[in-house]
Each structure stands twice: as C-alpha cells, then as structure tokens.
Amino acid sequence: MKIVYIHESIAHKGGLERIFVDKMNYLADRLQYEVYLLTASQGNTPVSFPLSPRVRHIDLGVRFHSQYQYRYPKRLWEAKKLDNLLKERAQMMIDNIHPDFIICTTAWKPEVIGLLKGKAKKIMESHCAREYMAISDNFSRGCVRDLFDRYTARTKFCAVRKYCDVLVTLTVSDARSWAKGCKQPILSLIHI
C-alpha cells in the first residue's frame, strides 16, 4: 500500500507535526507501507521530529512565504500562482507514485490538494473544530481582512465537503461540528 502525506512543511515543533511524523513512522516501520511525505516549502530546514528512513521525503520547492513581499492585490495574484505551482508539482509526484491514499489537513490547502487527479482516496484530518477555521491567528484585523478570513475558511470547508473521501477529527465534538453539511464518513480518533 502506498500512502502520501502532503503538508507545507514539518519544520515547527507542534502537535500536528508530531502526529503526522508518528503516523508516518508507524505506517512505514510497523505496517511496512510505502509512505511518502510531500512538503511544499521545507527547503533545507530539518524535519522537526525524527523521521524514519523508510519514509521518503520529497520537497516540492513551492516557497509560499515569497508572496508576503508584495502588497495587496498583487499578493493575492502571487498566492494563486503558488497554489497552481503546488498543484502542478504535486500532481507530477502523484502520477509517479500512484498512491492508494493521499492524506492532508483541513487547514492547509484542501482546496488545492482536493483537485489532484488519480485513483487515490483523499483523507483529510481536522485538528480543530469547524467553527475555528474562520478565526485568524491575529483575531480581528479589520473588516476587510476579517471578511477575507471568513471567505478563506468557507473555501476550505467547501473543498473538504467536495473532495475528501474520509474526514478524520480528533474528538467526537469536532466530528459533530464537521458533520453539519458533510456527507463523507467522519472518523473521530483520540491520539494518545
């Protein structure tokens, strides 16, 4: 079985990164699956947690941080170009690997990853309740920015609803939250 994880990077020492690395290591070492980690912008930054040598890490070289050197509206144009580059490079890798499953999060680019073509089932993991996707890290940043944040969250939610085959949540409460408007099977997993 071939499994591809897609994420921006595994450079932060956070809970999501730890869970992803633990799962990839388990699937590769214990269950002997072929596991790939596709990162968009890992670059030369080391992976934040020990990654099994059996997990194949491929960085796609899409530097999303480069869009922040521009002011709006050019920044939006650059962001769209980077999304297209991510889709193009990830699709090339998916075409070469032919995975059975593609795994990503609801928070990072489900609207792009959902468009990848192939026979792979798409599993999206939610590490927060659906309601919290519309809250930016900086909280209120002005009316226009708040509207944009809500639009972005709605786009992600619609992508999850449209493209994912299975949605995985961390708690039963999160599963209930996501169930509103989703027809996909929703699994609730408690990570220990």
Which ranges hold each PLM region?
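Extreme N-terminal starter segment of soluble prokaryotic enzymes
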Residues: 1-4
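N-terminal strand-loop element at the rim of the active site
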Residues: 7-13, 26, 30-76, 174-179
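Conserved alpha-helical elements of sugar-nucleotide-dependent glycosyltransferases
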Residues: 15-23
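Membrane-proximal helix-turn-helix segments that form the acceptor-binding/catalytic region
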Residues: 89-93, 146-167
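Active-site proximal beta-strand in glycosyltransferases
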Residues: 101, 116-137
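Short His-centered aromatic/hydrophobic patch
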Residues: 104-109, 126
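Conserved small/polar residues in nucleotide/adenosyl-binding loops
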Residues: 191-192
